[in-house]
Amino acid sequence: MRRRGAIGIGTLIVFIAMVLVAAVAAGVIIGTAGYLEQKAQAAGRQTTQEVASGIKVLNVYGYTNATPPSNGTIERMAIFITPNAGSEGIDLSNVKIVLSDGRRLVVYNYSGSFQNAESVKDLFNMTYVGVWNSTNGTASFGIAVINDIGSEMQGTHPTLEFGDMVALCVWTTMFEYEDKDGIGPSTRITGKVIPERGAAGVLDFTTPATFSYNVMVLQ
């Protein structure tokens, strides 16, 4: 009887130990599953933000200062952008613009030059829009604010929110056409407006065969 009792107690101890081990294992599994679920949710949110966030290029305008315009090159460009629908705020101080004419590639960074241009009648007039003066001859861009829904945009870290619209102002005199600074006629330009996060705005156009006006629509 004593041997049977000892065996029974031993079996009970083993059973209890197995239950405890199973409980600990279950706790570890549940904890790991919870952690993985949170990681998956965070990754899903991040992926959604990456897909939804980004920059949309609305229009691109070019400018030549020559008289007549057909004698000149495109020396300046204004790239109008807005956020994609559902996009988070985009810090324009971290944006880069990449432009290429197939022979040269230029990367522009934010110059820190920022101006409210909602009431400006001539965006390419250097008297009214000072960002052109501060970026002249450099691989940097200035920002002319066309529409600021929340009136919260400021120069140090200008943040583009849904409904906002700005013009990124760049000099294109780093390019050359027939020994003249600037972009010539019938030239294909490709590039991107690249935010820190999210989809880049696409630039892809061919300049007119003849420059009939000082200001021209490029894209």
UniProtKB/Swiss-Prot annotation:
Q: Which InterPro entries match?
A: Flagellin/pilin_N_arc, Flagellin_arc
Q: Please list the residues that make up the propeptide.
A: 1-5
Report whether Phosphoprotein shows up as a keyword of the record. no
Q: Give UniProt keywords alphabetically.
A: Archaeal flagellum
Chief subcellular location: other
The subcellular localization recorded is: Archaeal flagellum
What processes in GO biological process is this protein linked to? archaeal or bacterial-type flagellum-dependent cell motility
Q: Coiled-coil segments, which residues?
A: none
GO MF terms, alphabetically ordered: structural molecule activity
Give GO cellular component annotations, separated by semicolons: archaeal-type flagellum
User: What protein family is recorded?
Assistant: Belongs to the archaeal flagellin family.
Role description: Flagellin is the subunit protein which polymerizes to form the filaments of archaeal flagella.
PANTHER family the record matches: FLAGELLIN B1
Give the protein's recorded name: Flagellin B4
- Give the gene symbol: flaB4
